Amino acid sequence: MVPGSPAAGAGPAPRALSLAARLSYAVGHFLNDLCASMWFTYLLLYLHSVRAYSSRGAGLLLLLGQVADGLCTPLVGYEADRAAGRCARCGPRKAWHLVGTVCVLLSFPFIFSPCLGCGAATPEWAALLYYGPFIVVFQFGWAATQIAHLSLIPELVTSDHEKVELTALRYAFTVVANITVFGAAWLLLRLQGSAREGPPDEAGDHLGVQDVPVFRTLSLCVVGVGAVFSLLFHLGTRERRRPPAQEPDERSPLLAPATARPLLLWKHWLREPSFYQVGLLYMSTRLIVNLSQTYIAMYLTYSLNLPKKFIATIPLVMYVSGFCSSFLMKPVNKCIGRNMTYFVGLLVILAFAAWVVLVDELGMAVYVAAVLLGGGCATILVTSLAMTADLIGPHTHSGAFVYGAMSFSDKVANGLAVMVIQSLHPCSLELCCRACVGFYHWVMVAVTGGVGVAATLSLCSLLVWPIRLRSWDPGAQP
């Protein structure tokens, strides 16, 4: 069976979602997107450059968060699928979304605030231990919200083009969230600079302990704005209700109706080659998007030696470019298909990597490079999510497990990659020595060009063996 094709015995196709319903769904991940923007772009920079923790210590905290997220994601996905029909008031997906939202709101501000009770004599390991529980709670909440929100896509719409449109709208608000974070960061840094008396000095143009209030205020703004949009999601999105499973009684038929659709369980997915093909492509995509977002601030600060305002303006340009690209996804997919759309996005990212390799001093051309990176990342991310929805097709009862498994590989791979990069950092006794200038230059090349080649190989496998279920026999017993 090809995912997305109608199955025998299936009910009538649901009506198309209204614009209000589509927008309500799209803002449901806004809090997660705001927090993820700060997490990936500023966590290492905050811990290493502002709090002066070692590169390995900062990488260890990010690894802890990614592993916690990765472990929680498939568990939440499995439980969300298992809870179908049990949450009579709001539905299992929305219930998990609410739990995750509360965890994020309560934990995230502590991550970007100074350690309570810590002083100048506090050893680094004790401070890192303090941040650990907040990071674990935050990542559990983030995973619960993400999986609940993603698994609603095949629940709400069935058409391929509607899935692309909903995914593109979701990503458009992801871009808006990133623009909001970087715009707020630029404003806070500018206000801090104008409040400083005396002529501007070189030290004031670079990050340091004086920037702690900027990140603390930014984290509080993030959770405040995100809470409002989460409320709008819960008020405007209706999850399709499923009747709870009933115990058989004397009036129940002994044989199930012949028209009932067999269920594709989580263990069946593990036998499908397409599950691993799409999973590898999704993991490669997330590595490119997340690692480039994580290290772009380091690259700007240490390799290009730009003032600290660029850690807000360059990511802002990237996500404006991504925002514009997201609206082209639906017509481009219709014209050239999923695979070619993804390939075009990869070509743009590889062009960025080649530019970084060939040019050491970008100057004002760094804005053009940011446009390329932002547009390419938006294209491959939206397309990979649409491919995942294609894989799930009508089997929405186990969709959360699929998204959970995909996210598990992505989160753990991201965490391990960051830890490896941080362990290779050449400056052990200071924040940045001469060697780290070239170090972050080649990190940006590796996380875009190197991982881009791996993504190309994954895409080639989908061209040879397209997405479809090959091993599952609907007539076999689970």
UniProtKB/Swiss-Prot annotation:
InterPro entries noted in UniProt: MFS_2, MFS_trans_sf
Record's bilayer topology term: Multi-pass membrane protein
Domain of life of the native organism: Eukaryota
UniProt record, GO biological process: alternative mRNA splicing, via spliceosome; carbohydrate transport; cysteine transmembrane transport; melanin biosynthetic process; negative regulation of melanin biosynthetic process; pigment metabolic process involved in pigmentation
Record flagged with keyword Transport: yes
Record's subcellular location: Melanosome membrane; Lysosome membrane
Lumenal side stretches: 48-56, 119-124, 190-216, 301-308, 360-361, 422-436
Pfam family, one: MFS_2
A GO molecular function held by the record: cysteine transmembrane transporter activity
Modified residues (N-acetylmethionine): 1
Sorted UniProt keywords: Acetylation, Amino-acid transport, Lysosome, Melanin biosynthesis, Membrane, Transmembrane, Transmembrane helix, Transport
Transmembrane intervals: 27-47, 57-77, 98-118, 125-145, 169-189, 217-237, 278-300, 309-329, 339-359, 362-382, 401-421, 437-457
Reaction(s) catalysed (UniProt annotation): L-cysteine(in) = L-cysteine(out)
Cellular component annotations (GO), alphabetically ordered: cytoplasm; late endosome; lysosomal membrane; lysosome; melanosome membrane; nuclear body
Residue numbers on the Cytoplasmic membrane side: 1-26, 78-97, 146-168, 238-277, 330-338, 383-400, 458-478
Function in brief: Transporter that mediates the import of cysteine into melanosomes, thereby regulating skin/hair pigmentation. In melanosomes, cysteine import is required both for normal levels of cystine, the oxidized dimer of cysteine, and provide cysteine for the production of the cysteinyldopas used in pheomelanin synthesis, thereby regulating skin/hair pigmentation. Also catalyzes import of cysteine into lysosomes in non-pigmented cells, regulating lysosomal cystine and cysteine storage, which is essnetial for redox homeostasis.
Similarity comment: family membership: Belongs to the major facilitator superfamily.
Protein name (record): Major facilitator superfamily domain-containing protein 12
UniProt source species: Equus caballus (Horse)
Top-level taxonomy: Eukaryota, Metazoa, Chordata, Craniata, Vertebrata
Gene: MFSD12
